[in-house]
Amino acid sequence: MASKLFVPILDNGTGIIKAQYVYSALTALTGRGIALARFSQPYPTRIMNMATATFLSSDCDEMLIIDCDINFTRADVDKLLSHDVPLVYGLYPKKALPLQWCVATLTDENPFGGDEPLVEVKRAGRGFMRVHRSVFEKMKPLVPEYHNHGRAEWQFWHEGCDNDGEWRSEDWWFCDNWRKLGGKVLVDQTICLQHIGDYSYGATIPNNS
């Protein structure tokens, strides 16, 4: 039986969603029988914890997170959903030149360019990711629980300084907690997306094998 998919529509509290995202979403998600919910909140940690709590209270098995400034295709979504792993990401660059992927690698060596689509990294940006319910269930003992208007929520997404004085964003923090549990942070290097700002930042990875 196919997994039930939850897709939160996230904006940054302004109500503005990039036109490229709307077109991508309509093209890639139409006809899939997914559960959709929109969230509007200016704080990244708040919106992600709200979306995750809604997902966990649903009967869906997996959550597909796509930021509202990502340009993607149906094929990108198909690839992400095809992997039998609990957590997987697509690649997109930061909104800056020269282009840099929104990932932190395990070593200083470039891990990309080989034949295998899945590459393990240390951390990845959450702008295009698929996560199974089991990831959050395993992570609950590591994070605080709180209540919001009578509903239980968990601080899966947090930002701040760690014990080494390094500032970590909410997606970095999430990856670190998953790796503490022995999980792998995997990216599909064949999914190379555009990050929409004043310019559409995008690139592809050449095969070096």
What are these regions (language model features)?
Residues 1-46:
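N-proximal low-complexity "stem/linker" segments adjacent to membrane-targeting elements
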Residues 2, 6, 143-209:
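C-terminal catalytic/acceptor-binding lobe
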Residues 35, 69, 86, 184-186, ...:
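Residue-level detector of anion-binding/catalytic polar loops
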Residues 52, 73-160:
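Conserved catalytic core of nucleotide-sugar-dependent glycosyltransferases
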Residues 59-71:
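Short beta-strand-to-loop acidic/aromatic patch adjacent to the donor-nucleotide binding site
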